[in-house]
Amino acid sequence: MNFILLSASDAHKIVIQKLMQYYIYDFSEYIKYDVGDNGLFEPYPNLMDYWERDNNQFPYVIKMNDKYIGFVLVKLINSIERNYFSIAEFFILKKYRREGIGKAIAVKVFNLHKGHWEVYQINSNIPAQIFWNKVISEYTKGQFEERLEDGKKIQNFEN
């Protein structure tokens, strides 16, 4: 696996915008999105906010052999109970899945952001639930909690 996880610069905005169309297409299986009259899905809300300074949002692009293969959007959520990191979106093009890249990227992202984490998946996205449960279980050596809340499965842990 010869992949690179890069902090997404301004130059990567358009790359993530375009990859987001594939992500939304994949996700439309679980939440019924439709394309507009222009043949595209609606733009991801507030995507450009990830490049605002000091906003606790961290966009990443994933490259393999000099080709873009995905992205990760991480947020630091400031909560009354505690601050925590969350993976807002995680996407790898289908042809690169099931090769261990997703797990390796997730581990790299977790290691970049130390603290409390909450990773959630919608109830209907069973493949994502299986993926995240396995990755987080291995990463934490089983030291994580899982709960159902507001139609989502949530894993939380400290690293």
Positions of the model-derived regions?
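Conserved N-terminal entry element of GNAT/NAT acetyltransferase domains
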Residues: 1-31
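Conserved GNAT-fold acetyl-CoA-binding loop/helix
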Residues: 24-48
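A short helix-loop-beta-strand connector motif used in the catalytic cores of GNAT acetyltransferases and
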Residues: 45-61
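Conserved beta-strand in the GNAT
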Residues: 59-61, 67-76, 86
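Conserved acetyl-CoA binding element of GNAT-fold acetyltransferases
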Residues: 82-94, 120
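Conserved acetyl-CoA-binding loop-helix of GNAT-fold acetyltransferases
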Residues: 92, 98-111
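Conserved beta-strand-loop-alpha-helix junction that forms the acyl-donor binding cleft
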Residues: 118-133, 137, 147-150, 158
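Glycine-rich ATP-binding loops of the HATPase_c
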Residues: 142-144
